């Protein structure tokens, strides 16, 4: 990685050869410039999730690493609406677990549900996110799943740029494939 930050493989993911995966994820997605993040923060480093989520071999390797940290007892997978749905679908193919998508807001038509797919009350869910800076979107998704009667067994972040700490502070178990500590 460049001199603007540092990266390391997440705890359990390193057992799955994630050191190489971390380098591949960062090489594919790390951009430099002046970026406005979805959190409202500005950064000179941006991780473009679509650069690894749309490359089949890298998506497969990332899904394998994420699947490797999903603990026994998890019965379902979920992801916040958006690009993370690509990753959660790939993880579902790796694990055979059913999945759900958590909308930001329920649609005004169809089922009008905030949680779409497979996440029944009582499900033990692994909530999966692609890149997290503040953890805000994942936290909202976790709360929506809990409101439906699900339990969050673990939150797994492909690239953590600080969100894991906030999620742990909120009481969640969190694992990351890659942890990035940007300098700005």
Which ranges hold each PLM region?
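Active-site-facing substrate-recognition patch
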Residues: 2-72
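Conserved dinucleotide-binding and phosphotransfer motif residues
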Residues: 73, 94-95, 148, 170
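Short, glycine/charge-rich flexible loops or terminal/linker lids adjacent to PRPP-binding catalytic cores
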Residues: 85-129, 133-139
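Short helix-loop-beta connector
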Residues: 71-75, 120-122
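Conserved hydrophobic/aromatic pocket- or pore-lining residues that grip, position, or stack substrates
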Residues: 40, 77, 99
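Short, well-ordered alpha-helices that flank and scaffold nucleotide-derived cofactor binding pockets
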Residues: 64, 68, 89, 93, ...
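PRPP-dependent phosphoribosyltransferase catalytic core
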Residues: 2-24, 143-184
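Short glycine-rich phosphate-binding loop at a beta-alpha junction
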Residues: 73-81, 156-157
């Amino acid at each position: 990685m460049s001199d603007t930050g540092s990266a390391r493989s997440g705890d359990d993911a390193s057992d799955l050869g994630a050191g190489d995966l971390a380098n591949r994820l960062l090489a594919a997605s790390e951009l430099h410039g002046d970026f406005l993040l979805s959190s409202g923060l500005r950064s000179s480093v941006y991780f473009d999730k679509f650069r690894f989520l749309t490359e089949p071999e890298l998506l497969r390797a990332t899904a394998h690493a994420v699947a490797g940290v999903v603990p026994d007892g998890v019965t379902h997978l979920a992801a916040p609406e958006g690009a993370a749905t690509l990753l959660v679908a790939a993880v579902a193919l790796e694990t055979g677990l059913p999945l759900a998508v958590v909308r930001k807001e329920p649609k005004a038509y169809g089922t009008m549900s905030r949680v779409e797919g497979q996440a029944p009350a009582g499900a033990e869910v692994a909530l999966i996110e692609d890149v997290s800076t503040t953890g805000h979107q994942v936290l909202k998704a976790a709360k929506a799943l809990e409101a439906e009667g699900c339990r969050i067994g673990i939150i797994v972040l492909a690239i953590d740029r600080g969100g894991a700490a906030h999620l742990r502070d909120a009481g969640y178990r969190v694992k990351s494939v890659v942890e990035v500590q940007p300098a700005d």
